[in-house]
Amino acid sequence: MFEKILIANRGEIALRVIRAAREMGIKSVAVHSTADADAMHVRMADEAICIGPPPSSDSYLSIPAIVSACEITGAEAIHPGYGFLSENANFVRILEDQDITFIGPTSEHIRIMGDKITAKDTMKALGVPCVPGSDGGVPDYENAIKVAEKLGYPIIIKATAGGGGRGMKVANNVGELEIAFRSARAEAKSAFGNDEVYMEKYLTTPRHIEIQVFGDGKGGAVHLGERDCSLQRRHQKVLEEAPGPVIDAATRARIGKVCADAVARINYIGAGTIEFLYENDEFFFIEMNTRLQVEHPVTEAVFGVDLVREQIRVAAGLPMSFTQGELQVNGHAIEVRINAERLPTFSPCPGKVKVFHAPGGLGVRMDSALYGGYSIPPYYDSLIGKLIVHGRDRPEALARLKRALGELIVDGVDTTVPLFHALLQEPDVLSGNYNIHWLEKFLAEKLG
């Protein structure tokens, strides 16, 4: 087992990894920018080292700075958290060359799944159901017309190197195709430095269902059920729950086995998430995230496992501490992502937190790096906390979420907490009757 690991991240996920390491008797090293000198992850870690100025490009995304921090502190392994360098194949390849263990998959698996076309081709070959679409990238508008005619409208154009909704455009007819195609390419070039796009049939009312998988790197893999992440704004998840309100045990076992078998066949190591659109009882693969997800706590709650601990174990060469047969769904869990943003525009709201009080009680977990007197810097993502609740069933989890939101105090900055109070009044949310477009429509009607 490792004696010391470095966490190449900040905020609540850095704290999450520090906690798991401490329970395992492993020393932790926090890295931070000058803007994060007073951050909670810096205070909580056994050691801390400054890696650069506030901009992410000069600190949390600086591969030389992070590798140097590893060498200076003697850390044997790096946990990337999510975001930043967590899915950067070049970073992982450098660590492999330096004999520093990356707590996650191999650089090759990250590379394969990072290219959306290669990922789709790989998954299709492994027996995972995929959305009908173009064979590879679509080089020009003339080819786009042919692909759209073959698939039938509406179609969606996506960036090959994309994610997070960037470089993604919908065309409902041939009249909309040219503008959608050219703007998707331009957006992809701007966001990813690569203007290659591909096309898929656009599903009109799907849910976003993702399967948590975990591999040991030696041909063994399990699934830990699904999460429903359909409540989204601009392709960004807002609320996640497990199990999914519309997925029964037989469906879970079937699609879970397909996913576990797929990652087992490629000797995948560590945590991964296979994301699907789900419509008319059919699953369609969209992408695989080769890292821990923001929403991993809902899976931990219903399965009673520590996914970060498991990541560290398998990275150190130890076997998984559970088998598929031991993984049983227990109750229902819901997570809401709380951002420092001003409604109704969702504009970032950095500033000083005067008072912070986390809710408590049975089945309530708050993952946050906030504290009273902390100044939220303007340089990073606006996520300031995740409130996770667990109940014996979905109604109990919803009641617990409502109660916990009422206890949460973040004074000094605007947050998205009022949005969740509003959502918990909506019959569709309470019944689980929503798809990936529901929240956008709700916001347009209620917030104008």
Predicted segments with their positions:
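ATP-dependent carboxylate activation and anion-phosphoryl transfer catalytic cores
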Residues: 7-24, 48, 71-73, 89, ...
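Structural detector of well-ordered beta-strand residues that form the stable sheet scaffold
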Residues: 29, 79, 101-103, 131, ...
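ATP-binding N-terminal substructure of ATP-dependent carboxylate-amine bond-forming enzymes
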Residues: 1-126, 138-146, 396
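Internal, active-site/partner-interface "lid" segment
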Residues: 134-136
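A polyampholytic, Gly/Pro-enriched intrinsically disordered region
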Residues: 122-131, 153-154
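Acidic/histidine-enriched active-site and ligand-binding environments that engage anionic O-linkages
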Residues: 147-156
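N-terminal nucleotide-binding beta1-loop-alpha1 segment
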Residues: 159
